[in-house]
């Protein structure tokens, strides 16, 4: 259920603000969004996988906190990110 290394690197490359950037909120939110999408698909098939459900809820909460941080620090970057990711906020 973990992200494939190539997929993760492509996400990092797409959302990085500078070369080698892996810690910016944009990159972290993009990686979390992909993991959330993957786990959501897993949960559609395995409805009773409560350990995964708990991890999924933790990731959603972490992404929500990062988006909130980004919204409070730089609203333009926040709006651009949710537009690129297709998130509803």
Swiss-Prot record:
Keyword Transport included in the entry's annotation: no
InterPro entries: Ribosomal_uS15, Ribosomal_uS15_bac-type, uS15_NS1_RNA-bd_sf
A Pfam family matched in the record: Ribosomal_S15
Protein keywords: Ribonucleoprotein, Ribosomal protein, RNA-binding, rRNA-binding
One Gene Ontology MF term: rRNA binding
Keyword Disulfide bond: no
GO cellular component term, pick one: cytosolic small ribosomal subunit
GO biological process: translation
SUPFAM superfamilies for the chain: S15/NS1 RNA-binding domain
PROSITE patterns, alphabetized: RIBOSOMAL_S15 (PS00362)
Function, as annotated: One of the primary rRNA binding proteins, it binds directly to 16S rRNA where it helps nucleate assembly of the platform of the 30S subunit by binding and bridging several RNA helices of the 16S rRNA. Forms an intersubunit bridge (bridge B4) with the 23S rRNA of the 50S subunit in the ribosome.
Subunit structure: Part of the 30S ribosomal subunit. Forms a bridge to the 50S subunit in the 70S ribosome, contacting the 23S rRNA.
Recorded family membership: Belongs to the universal ribosomal protein uS15 family.
Protein name: Small ribosomal subunit protein uS15
Organism, scientific name: Paenarthrobacter aurescens (strain TC1)
Gene that encodes the chain: rpsO
